Regions:
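RNase H-like nuclease fold core
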Residues: 1-78, 85, 89-100, 104-198, ...
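Alpha-helical structural motif
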Residues: 59, 152-155, 200, 213, ...
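Short leucine-rich amphipathic alpha-helices used at interfaces
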Residues: 63-64, 204-205, 211-212, 262, ...
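Amphipathic alpha-helical/coiled-coil segments positioned at domain termini
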Residues: 79, 100-103, 214-356
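Acidic, contiguous segments within the catalytic cores of piggyBac-derived transposases
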Residues: 191-195, 203, 207-222, 229
Length: 356
């Protein structure tokens, strides 16, 4: 999977983990990393909960393994993930030679959640009309900061000026005015501006100037995304449905098949009609609650399937042994205590419905 990337000596990667069941009782976690340029899956690692101690630690274990796997083949220059605190701590303390970034979408999602919570209050209802613009402003700030944290921070905070109809100001080093063109009189009259003394403005200030958010902006300077890992995770549901138990070998095999399937379509162009017009699919995402269009890709040619079948047939004919999956030494049960004899459990069984 890394043959093309190895030609240039280093790659930027994006990573994400996926548990086999919702909540905090997962048995397996699958951690995948992709080449950021091609969106191809570079490595997939399966972690059983007994290897990490509990399900909350599995993502860090999977991340470390995936990064180590890729590091054996090529040099990793930059790593982009979600806002996982354990992964971030590991990168800042143990991988200082690599650039670390977060997916902008995850930060925007956090801001949106806070905005919706604030607008639920009657006195902050006006803020609801600005929610989409504020989130778009964070996207824009990250995309246009030129890799500078200081520029990104000033651009983000400038939303506090714009919402109260103030479009130029002093005191900053880089950003002194809004980037939009001069508003027409009609546009200015129709816009529901927020007064600086209002509860809505105070609530917005608390969100925009949140210390953790401002600190996290330094990981958004390269405007990176991990959306393609979600595409792989969605495809993985076909091969490895959640809340369905598989053996360790089964998990690894299914994840590898999903990776091959994903990579077969990663570089496909957008499909077109017979007249050469690009094809689009209309969708209504729940999070945005807006109709959007998404490109339809050309059909996959799963040539790897025929190669796999040919290899299996060839190995059977030649009595050759296929490469088997290496299974780590794992306890037969993920329970924290050894399984007792069935007879002793029956003997100690009591029911609240039949206590005697």
């Amino acid at each position: 999977m890394l043959n093309n990337a190895s030609l240039k000596g280093h790659i930027n990667v994006i990573g994400d983990g996926r548990c086999d069941s919702p909540g905090h009782n997962a048995k397996y976690l699958t951690y995948s990393m992709q080449n950021q340029d091609t969106k191809e899956v570079a490595t997939v690692n399966v972690v059983q909960v007994t290897e990490a101690g509990n399900s909350n630690r599995m993502e860090l274990v999977g991340f470390k393994r995936a990064l180590a796997d890729i590091g054996q083949t090529v040099s990793v220059k930059q790593v982009t993930t979600d806002r996982h605190s354990q992964v971030r701590k590991h990168m800042l303390e143990n991988e200082k030679d690599k650039v670390y970034q977060n997916d902008v979408w995850h930060v925007v999602k956090s801001v949106l959640k806070k905005l919706r919570k604030a607008t639920a209050k009657k006195e902050c209802a006006l803020l609801n009309k600005w929610t989409r613009s504020i989130c778009n402003h964070l996207w824009w700030s990250s995309a246009t900061c030129g890799g500078s944290y200081d520029v990104l921070k000033e651009k983000w905070i400038s939303i506090l000026q714009h919402v109260k109809n103030r479009h130029s100001w002093g005191g900053n080093k880089f950003v002194h005015k809004c980037s939009h063109s001069k508003l027409t009189n009609s546009k200015e009259r129709k816009t529901k501006w927020i007064q600086a003394s209002s509860p809505s403005y105070k609530a917005l200030q608390d969100i925009v100037l949140n210390k953790r958010l401002l600190k996290d902006l330094k990981y958004l300077t390269n405007f990176d995304h991990t959306g393609s890992t979600e595409v792989y995770n969605a495809l993985l549901n076909k091969y490895c449905p959640k809340s369905t138990h598989f053996s360790y070998e089964g998990m690894v095999s299914r994840c590898q098949l999903a990776a091959l399937d994903h990579n077969a379509g990663a570089l496909l162009p957008q499909a077109t009609t017979k007249m050469g017009v690009a094809r689009w699919n209309v969708a209504f995402p729940k999070h945005s609650k807006n109709w959007v269009v998404k490109p339809i890709k050309a059909s996959k040619e799963k040539t790897y399937v025929h190669k796999m079948v040919d290899r299996v047939v060839e190995s059977v004919k030649s009595d050759d042994t296929l490469l088997r999956i290496t299974v780590p030494k794992l306890p037969p049960n993920i329970a924290s205590t050894p399984k007792p004899e069935k007879s002793s459990i029956i003997a100690s069984h009591r029911s609240r419905f039949h206590p005697y």
